[in-house]
Amino acid sequence: VAYKYFKDSELACKHTGENGMDVAFMKVIEAIREECGFPFRVSSAYRHPTHPIEAGKQKPGAHASGKAIDILVSMEQAFILVEVALKHGIIGIGISQKGPIGTRFIHLDMDKSRSRPRIWSY
């Protein structure tokens, strides 16, 4: 699937190279990106269940379902991203806004198999 704002390589699992992103979820992310009006730098998207982060969990997380993405963003843009994501029905939001600016991110997901809606910090 081709997306307007994202390359397959940035959505693929960094462990296997497989892209298992959910198409309906990505349509929502594309709409959020469009409304935000600034580029999204992806730090993590799809993670195959064998990815070291997922393999260490009792049950694979939202990234393994293809319904989660982590966007490197901070300060005012982080606020805008959360505001727009909520408008578009995102039900899982993880906030990591400590440390160097370039490492801060917002996790967005729509994994209804998990306890949602939720917001948490890392």
Which functions belong to the PLM regions below?
Residues 27-57:
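Extended, low-complexity, intrinsically disordered C-terminal regulatory tails
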Residues 6-8, 33-39, 70-73:
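Generic detector of short, locally flexible boundary/turn motifs and exposed helical patches
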Residues 60, 65, 69, 73-122:
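Catalytic cores and adjacent binding grooves of peptidoglycan-active enzymes
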Residues 24-28, 38, 51, 67, ...:
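Amphipathic alpha-helical interface surfaces
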Residues 1-33, 101, 112, 117, ...:
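Extracytoplasmic cell-surface/polysaccharide-interacting catalytic and binding patches
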